[in-house]
Amino acid sequence: MHPIRSVLIVTKPGHPTALDLAQDIGVWLTRRGVSCRILEGPGEALPLRQLAADAGLVLVLGGDGTMLGVARRLAGTGVPLLGINLGRVGFLAEVPAGEWAATLERLLAAPLRVERRLALRFGVERGGVEIFQGDAVNDVVINRGALARVITLDIDVDGERLAGLRADGLIISTPTGATGYAVSARGPLMDPALDAFTVTPICPFLGNFPPLVLGGGSVCSVRIREQGTEVHATIDGQEGIALRSGDRITLTGLRDGLCFATLGGGGYCARLRACGFVRDHACTLPDMLPDEGGTSTDV
């Protein structure tokens, strides 16, 4: 991509530290000839998309939650994002707050490199009419309400029936979201570059529905076959939709829907270790070669 000439900074709303840091970064960028605009909180999708259209980079100051909100509103625009981590995990907002200057110096010194990933696009249909459409960065979760009862869902893939599922819920996750709720439900970790998404049940009745990986172009349809129990769809853990019996959610991959500025350096495995998703138990194996007497070492 071309060198960065303009930056939109989006801060976590109501976070004085983020706003102060945004002012510091804005001054730093202006001194280097880069135009800058600061927005407190992502707000509504349309104004954010309009502001981001003129930016070569959207810099997000907050944690992974703030990154999710911004990335979801900008899904499909192709505008690259970079997160400065003021939160905890920092799997999406990967730049430590104390390293912002060195990171931006590197980004301004060469053409920007980006990593494009799959997002989810979904619609909710009620009585044959689409009542909601949206995008998801991490996942769409269909689950029960306050009562501790299983729900029943009918699942189709590409127009073919897959199964009727009785479970606490269902997680449809992107590769980016595989390290979120899905991995807690024993879904697979996925390389973010994969053109695929997962369908993972939450506590399936009798355990008869393993996690399923679908190609990014697949269409997964989930119909609510439940009477008298509250059912909700939650998008990225941030937005919710109340569902009724007979409602149908249709989901598919949005190729290149997410765009992140990449810094190089550590790869996916290094990030998994750094964020605690895998543990590296170093060990020394015994010498299995025969000794000079022709006998092998006992193990």
Swiss-Prot record:
Which InterPro entries did the record assign? ATP-NAD_kinase_N (IPR017438), ATP-NAD_kinase_PpnK-typ_C (IPR017437), NAD/diacylglycerol_kinase_sf (IPR016064), NADK (IPR002504)
Q: Where in the cell is it found?
A: Cytoplasm
What catalytic reaction does the record list? Answer: NAD(+) + ATP = ADP + NADP(+) + H(+)
Task: Cite the active-site annotation.
Answer: 64 (proton acceptor)
Look up keyword NAD and say if it applies. yes
The record's listing under SUPFAM superfamilies reads: NAD kinase/diacylglycerol kinase-like (SSF111331)
Which co-factor is required? a divalent metal cation
What's in the keyword line of the UniProt record? ATP-binding, Cytoplasm, Kinase, NAD, NADP, Nucleotide-binding, Transferase
Q: What is its EC number?
A: 2.7.1.23
Broad class of where this protein is predominantly found: cytoplasm
**Record: residues binding NAD(+):** 64-65, 138-139, 149, 166, 168, 179-184, 238
Q: Which GO terms describe its cellular component?
A: cytoplasm
What's an example GO BP annotation here?
A: NADP biosynthetic process
Is NAD a UniProt keyword of this protein? yes
- Entry's Gene3D superfamilies? Probable inorganic polyphosphate/atp-NAD kinase, domain 1, Probable inorganic polyphosphate/atp-NAD kinase, domain 2
Q: Name one GO molecular function term.
A: ATP binding
Domain of life, per lineage: Bacteria
Function, as annotated, reads: Involved in the regulation of the intracellular balance of NAD and NADP, and is a key enzyme in the biosynthesis of NADP. Catalyzes specifically the phosphorylation on 2'-hydroxyl of the adenosine moiety of NAD to yield NADP.
Family listed: Belongs to the NAD kinase family.
Q: What is this protein called?
A: NAD kinase
Organism in which the protein naturally occurs = Nitratidesulfovibrio vulgaris (strain ATCC 29579 / DSM 644 / CCUG 34227 / NCIMB 8303 / VKM B-1760 / Hildenborough) (Desulfovibrio vulgaris)
In the UniProt record, the gene name given for this protein reads nadK
